[in-house]
């Protein structure tokens, strides 16, 4: 949540060098999709971001009609895939750090900060600024008002995003296989929440816990750091190939 596509650029370049056609993108209001003015003018929520991800998927399908379509998503990007309007075209999902963001499924040491953010800091900042200035505050990233408030509702519900009407059926009806990778040292999500999100999909194939090597922290976002190129990146490529075999 709140991570620009530029963060994933080194991994995407490496993946392309292995012969994979890759498209990365920014949701509206984020990164290269952020307008020059204030985020106050961006009327986008997470349902809007579902449509953005779907548009990216369809664009890739139009550009390369003969290739199988895979989604490699990190955190929220993986969570949204099961609800895409064009999900029937997806050949498989490789999910990194995909878990329930419900406050009760977060790491115990992280819960009090999440509670403060969801109950006080987030709503107050949005009311004052018209968007969430996360970069200024050192908390996630800058987010459109609607995205922050919808995410807040999800995180305060035991069913997380599945609390939205009809999403249970959508995710259970998604036929694509899911491979989910969870880092044992994830500082945010508990493994239980990651497994719950995994089995919420209709075709959960493989759940794997990544154990960091000595001194090589992984965490919630760290799989994509260049230090993991020799070890973890080839494993991700292997799983992508598994999804189309």
Per-range role (PLM):
Residues 1, 70-75, 183:
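Conserved alpha/beta-hydrolase "nucleophile elbow" surrounding the catalytic nucleophile
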Residues 5-37:
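Conserved alpha/beta-hydrolase
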Residues 42-62:
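Alpha/beta-hydrolase active-site loop
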Residues 72-157:
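Alpha/beta-hydrolase-fold enzymes
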Residues 154-171, 176:
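Active-site nucleophile elbow and catalytic-triad environment of alpha/beta-hydrolase enzymes
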Residues 174, 180-182, 186:
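Short beta-strand/loop motif that positions the catalytic acidic residue
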Residues 190-200:
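Short alpha-helix in the alpha/beta-hydrolase fold that links the catalytic acid
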Residues 208-245:
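Catalytic active-site module of serine/aspartate enzymes centered on a nucleophile-bearing elbow/loop
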